[in-house]
A protein has these predicted regions:
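Non-catalytic helical tethers at domain boundaries
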Residues: 18, 35-39, 43, 64
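Compact, glycine-rich, soluble single-domain proteins
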Residues: 4-30, 42, 46-48, 56
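Short beta->alpha connector loops
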Residues: 10-11, 34-35, 60
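C-terminal structural segments of small proteins and small subunits
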Residues: 45-73
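Conserved short beta-strand edge segments in small beta-sheet-based binding/regulatory domains
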Residues: 28-31, 71-73
């Protein structure tokens, strides 16, 4: 599963990191050739100003994933 989001600024990246950390499954962000764990603060700060795909395994609950992405936006 994946959805695109824009990571606007440092505070937005921190919020995404917190939400990903609370998730019951692993959440990743992909931008170009970069793939980072969304729960990693250091990794998230490298994504500021980029459009990224929020990625999770397909065997996770789709509705839960969509709710998570809506909170991240």
């Amino acid at each position: 599963m994946n959805r695109e989001i824009d990571i606007r600024n440092r505070e937005h990246a921190i919020n995404i990191c917190k939400l990903a950390g609370k998730s019951s499954y692993e959440v990743w962000l992909s931008a170009g050739t970069t793939l980072v764990n969304a729960a990693s603060m250091l990794s998230m700060l490298t994504m500021v100003g980029k459009t990224a795909s929020v990625v999770a395994r397909d065997d996770n609950d789709a509705q839960s994933f969509l709710r998570l992405v809506r909170e991240m936006v």
